[in-house]
Amino acid sequence: MWDGFSNSFWSRDYITGINRAQRLINEGVEQNEKLLQLLHIRAKSASSCSDLLFKSFSKFNKHHPLNEESNDLPSDAAIHQLYESYLMEASLHKKLGEQLNILVINPFANWSKKYSRRVDEIVSAAIVKINNYNSRFSHVNSKKSNLTDRKPIPTSRKSNKSDSLASALSQLDINPSNVNKFDGLINIVDHPYTAEEFANVLLKLMKASTVKRKSYSHLGDYELVTNCSLLFEAIKTTFGLEKDSYVVKAGNQLIQHGLIRLLGIRRVFENDPEIDAQFTTKSQQLLKSYHLSILEVDPYFQVNDPITATNDDPVLQKYNLAYDNLEQCRHELELYLFMVFKDLEQAELDRLNAVKSVLVECSNYSGNFIPSLNSIFIDNLNSFKNLDSLRDMSTQINKHYTGYFIPVSNNELSTKDEYLFLQKSSLTEDNLIVSLVPKILAYLLDAYSYERDEEVLSCVWTTEVPLKDAFDLKSVLRKTDNVESVLNACVEKYTLSSITCSLRLCLLEFPDSLIRSSFYDYFKAIYTTYTDFEDLDHRLYSIKKCLLHLHSTPLHILEEIIRHLSAYAISIRMKDGQIRHLAKIISPCVLRPPDDLNIIPVEDTHPTLLVIDLINEFENLFADLERPSTPPVEIERALTPITTSPQKLKLPRSSSPCKNPSPTRRFRPF
């Protein structure tokens, strides 16, 4: 199935896709030159043949004058007639050459020059836009480099939405009004403590951790700071824990209770001397409630929180502004490139149609002027009329294909040690998308029943809509909690296809696909080996094995989407071709290649095949699936791409339908 230029020439760096599209266009320009040269040769040969015939007949007539009055014999008259026919043929050759130049060659040559200028202007403007984006990216990257010594980095940017933090806290089961209160017992590694008992334990823990004031450039001074390595040993001795796994568990429980926070992007406690931790306001208030304190003076409450302090720091404000400009530039660039690819596609289609017209016209003129060769030109004419411009373009696209559209993520602006440099896709925004997906699916499910046109209903997910409309609707949806009322208010402006497209954009903006990109080569090997219908059990076993490794959040979203698409496909009685088209559109959300893969091979159809199996075999795959439990504190980590392979899944060997060694051993991420 062919998607045209707009979904075939995307790359992570943008410029590679543009260069491939330009290479295709340049091959078309070379084809124009080749055709013009051939037509020039034909016209020149016709004129040369005419000149040669006239010159030769003049010499013949000088030595053997032919006069109708002397044609007494029938044979002389026949020879004279032959001479006249040759003269007529010479004049026809001359006229053919002139007509080819006037009616075919010159117009096509002028059109080719305009075509070359047209595509050059389109590509040049796109390259200027890309260079502008790259310069902005370098500017932001240089600002990031100037802040590399700054720790901690804020874990999220201030959201434009006033209640977004409350939304995130609600998903983490944290009530802001009760954030500094303890009700009942405090359990740490299955040991219950009363609030007073735990206050004394917490004081010992602070002293053992050697907490101190620490200064961070551009952020100021912070009290009660220690590194995770010292804190690890302090927890081990204070709570009397022997196993390191219990120490890690205790540290994570302290984080969940809001007594400790890790400074940076980390959300899971571990024995790492490079990561700093801070005892929070809640822990200090717990000590004060029992007249305990580790600080002689209590300046802690006057220290700005790193999240809110960011907004008052001039250096970080400049970084915020530069980052916002970069994201705005990226947004505009992707919209512009869609238009560029559409223009290039139309230009190439116009060129192929022009070539077809030139070939047909040339055959028409040649056949009319030279009756003796008319049968040959008729055959050529029939062949030229059957030329399929779209098929030629599809072949060229497959030859130069770079990949389908995936919005570029600027997650690389974070440092190598994973400290977050004001990353745009923060935990709060990701949680908004997580809550947004089921609401949109529920609205669509209700909207299907009101659509009476079956043809429109069957194309809700596959109809192409302007990318700008989808971006605008996505922005509106992410700023509201009442999705249904917003969609009802926008029903006249946005179609159901715009809603589905905006939903796909939300999913594409996740740092990783719903099935982690580390499984990309694994599924490629699966669908390269098990291609027959008889291999369905092998594929389903491999898919289910992968699903067991997913975090609960992306697994829940994946299940909701596949359940919706499966019911949608059944309700409108989708055929295999329609399901394949639907799967190809949704596949980048489900499984996409790793970030280091700049060009996606056109042969990589396994994400589409995977989605087809998920839709067709939904009940078999998700019915008895054991969901892994993901603690609320790990939601951000669940939505963050990983570079390490998941641990090997321990399943009974007898449950596998594969009797022979699996061909995916080298790709298997388990």
Swiss-Prot record:
Source organism superkingdom: Eukaryota
UniProt keyword list: Coiled coil, Cytoplasm, GTPase activation, Phosphoprotein
Segments of this protein annotated with the region Disordered: 141-161, 641-670
GO cellular component: cell cortex; cell division site; cytoplasm; division septum
GO molecular function: GTPase activator activity
Marked site positions, Arginine finger: 462
Classification via Pfam families: RhoGAP
Gene3D superfamilies reported for this sequence: Arfaptin homology (AH) domain/BAR domain (1.20.1270.60), Rho GTPase activation protein (1.10.555.10)
Protein's name in the database: Probable Rho-GTPase-activating protein 9
Source taxonomy: Eukaryota, Fungi, Dikarya, Ascomycota, Taphrinomycotina
